[in-house]
């Protein structure tokens, strides 16, 4: 009886000691509050559950939709819905979590996007946001965001103006 209880306890401890990193994620060990080691891509990671956790960072493409009122060259506010497609570079995941924390999307991506989109849209007329210059506006926002975020470990794949009102 004691052996079976000990065996069940050992098996449950082993299962609590492993974490699965799925495809499109990297895992970084956090031991006693400090990030240690290098990011590990998909697979099983074994940890000591009382002192270590795994911080998972998605490296697949993320689609972030944002609704904003953007200024135009005439001084009008144009309501818009815009999508940002981006991903995190696997080798920079540790640096991102160390520098910014788990809330990196709100802190870096969205604040940079709001600034870049307001700067770019203020150079165009409101009618240009509905016409053929839409692609130019998207490309300018993407270039400005990429310039600011590429050294921090983010790849901006695309910026899409979905609806303009």
Which role does the model predict for each range below?
Residues 1-2:
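N-terminal hydrophobic targeting signals that begin at the initiator methionine
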Residues 85, 105-165:
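Amphipathic, coiled-coil-like alpha-helical scaffolding segments used for oligomerization/assembly
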Residues 19-121:
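Hydrophobic membrane-anchoring helix/hairpin
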Residues 15-17:
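Sec/Tat signal peptide C-region and signal peptidase I cleavage site
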Residues 5-13:
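Sec-dependent N-terminal signal peptides
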